[in-house]
Amino acid sequence: MTVVSVSMPESLLDRLDEFAEEHGYTGRSEVVREASRNLLGEFEDKKLEGRELMGVVTVVFDHETSSAEERMMQIRHDHEHTVVSNVHNHVGDHYCMELFILEGELDEISTFVGKVRATSDILSVDYSVVPLDDFEADLAH
């Protein structure tokens, strides 16, 4: 197996070590491998390809030390055909939370999430997607 080096804040490394211990992992490498597989597989679900999806993306960043807010606005404008709605909230003393409601196909949503994740100074990105046609069967009854 190839050995790699990864840079991360000490606080994140501490959390990673605690997580590994609490959940019975043999070490941080096992946690990072599993997380990497999960991240890479997120948008590779063949059941979602070619289907119209709705998605929610939640982004958290420190508004005092980053230009992330400006970048979020730029990404939103670049994907205005996919972004149905966007809410910006102040959370705590230093943080902003952006909530994006998306509608589109898998490749459009994954491109949007990828650009958000690639933005420097982002503290957290979370999302979920649901196929719109999942509700058609419920409405037919």
UniProtKB/Swiss-Prot annotation:
Binding site residues for Ni(2+): H77, H88, H90, C96
GO BP terms: response to nickel cation
Keywords, ordered alphabetically: DNA-binding, Metal-binding, Nickel, Transcription, Transcription regulation
UniProt keyword Protein biosynthesis present: no
GO molecular function: DNA binding; DNA-binding transcription factor activity; nickel cation binding
InterPro entries with a match to the protein in the record: Acetolactate_synth/TF_NikR_C, ACT-like_dom_sf, Arc_rbn_hlx_hlx, CopG, CopG/NikR_regulator, Ni_resp_reg_NikR, Ribbon_hlx_hlx, TF_NikR_Ni-bd_C
Cofactor requirements of the protein: Ni(2+)
UniProt cofactor note: Binds 1 nickel ion per subunit.
SUPFAM superfamilies attached to this UniProt entry: ACT-like, Ribbon-helix-helix
Keyword Transcription listed: yes
Family named by the database record: Belongs to the transcriptional regulatory CopG/NikR family.
Function (record text): Transcriptional regulator.
Alphabetical list of HAMAP family matching this protein: NikR (MF_00476)
Protein's name according to its UniProt entry: Putative nickel-responsive regulator
